[in-house]
Amino acid sequence: MSRKYFGTDGIRGRVGEYPITPDFMLKLGWAAGMAFRKQGHCRVLVGKDTRISGYMFESALEAGLSAAGADVMLLGPMPTPAIAYLTRTFHAEAGIVISASHNPHDDNGIKFFSGQGTKLPDEVELMIEELLDQPMTVIESGKLGKVSRINDAAGRYIEFCKSSVPSSTSFEGLKLVVDCAHGATYKVAPSVFRELGADVTVLHAQPDGLNINEGCGSTHIESLQAAVLVGHADLGIAFDGDGDRVLMVDHTGAIVDGDELLFIIARDLQEHGKLQGGVVGTLMSNLGLELALKDLDIPFVRAKVGDRYVMAELLEREWLVGGENSGHVVCCNHTTTGDAIIAALQVLMALKRRGETLAQARQALRKCPQVLINVRFGASKVDPLEHPAVKEASAKVTDALAGRGRVLLRKSGTEPLVRVMVEGEDESQVRAHAEALAKLVSEVCV
C-alpha cells in the first residue's frame, strides 16, 4: 500500500507548508495516539531538536495525543537516538521526534519510534495514515491524556553513552574538537567526552532556533577541519542537527566518512571476537569498504539507502554493525538506531586499543573514487529514472566501467532530488560519466 504522508524517514518538509503545519501536527498527534492506544491506555515520549518551530509542533502534538487519551512525557531538545533509548527504558508505547535532521531551520519533520526504540513498523504507519483521513474526535474528559516533563533526560542519556565504553577505558590525554551543529547534541556530547577524560574544545553549541546546521556540523565540516589544525587536536567529531549522523576529521584535517568509521568499528569488534556476522552497508557505500572487509573475511551486504533499511537488514541477519557513508552508524550491541555519540565512542575505543591515530586507522580502507551529483527535479511529471534515454545512458556507463565500478541513480526519500552516483578506479573518468548522466537527468526533468 502506498504512503500518503510518510517517507523513508517519517514526515518532513518546509515549515508552514502542508503537511508541516500546526493543524496537521494536531491531527497527527491524535491519529498517532489513537493508533498507539488500540490496546488501552498508553504513554508517548516526545523530543525535538533545537529548531524554533519545534516548540510550536511540540504543543500541537501534545494536544492531539492528549485528545486521544495518550499520556505525554516531554523530553525537550535531545538527540534522536536518545529519544529512542528513553522510549525503551521508560517502557513507553512510542516515541516521537520533532526534527528535520541535517536540513536547515526552516524545514522540520516528525519521525516515530516503537516501544522497543526501533523505527515504527510499516503497518503502524499505515494505520496512522488511515486515521489521519478520519474526523478527529476527543475522548471523554476523564480519560484525556496527562502531560509531564522528564527533567533528568539528558543525564540519563549521558550515563547510557558512557556505559558503552568499558569502565577501565579512559580518554585522558586525547585532544578533541566537537562540532554540535547548534543542534540536539549541544548539551550531552561535550559532557560525555569530558566525563570520559578527553580534553574537549566545543564548536557550534549555542543554538538560537535558527542556526541549526548553518555552516556547521557534519554537512559543513570546513570549520571543524580548521579548528583541528589550529588547535593541534588529535581529531575532530562532527554531528548533524539531531545527533544521528557523525563524521570525523583526522589530525591532518582529512575528512573520515561513515564508510571509514564503520570499517574501524567492525575491524575492532572482529579483533576482539565480538563482531557476530558481517556488516550492512547501503547502495551508496563505497566499493573500497566492501573490498577492505573482504580482505578481513568479513561478510558485507548492501541495503537500500536509509538507516531504517540498514536496521531491518541487521535485525533479519542478527548482525551487529551497519551504516551509511553519510555518517549513520548503527551498533546493535548498544543501540536500536543510528547513534552518532555511541558510534564516535566506539571509534575512539578502537583507536585506543590499537594504539593508532585516526589517520593511521583509515589507511586500511582504500576508497574508490566516487562522484555524487544531486539533480533537483521539481514538479516535473516525468520520472527520470524510467526515461528510456536515462536508462540507456546508465547502461552504457556501466558497460564502460567493465565490472570495475558502479552506477546508481535513485530518488531521495526526503527531498525532490535525483542522486546520480558513479564509482570506479579512474577519478576523471568517473566524474565525466557522472556529469554527463546528471546533465541528461536534468534535461528530461524539464
UniProtKB/Swiss-Prot annotation:
Modified residues (Phosphoserine): 101
Domain of life of the source: Bacteria
GO molecular function, one term: phosphomannomutase activity
Record: active site: 101
Role according to the record: Catalyzes the conversion of glucosamine-6-phosphate to glucosamine-1-phosphate.
UniProt-listed HAMAP family: GlmM_B
Protein name: Phosphoglucosamine mutase
Family (UniProt): Belongs to the phosphohexose mutase family.
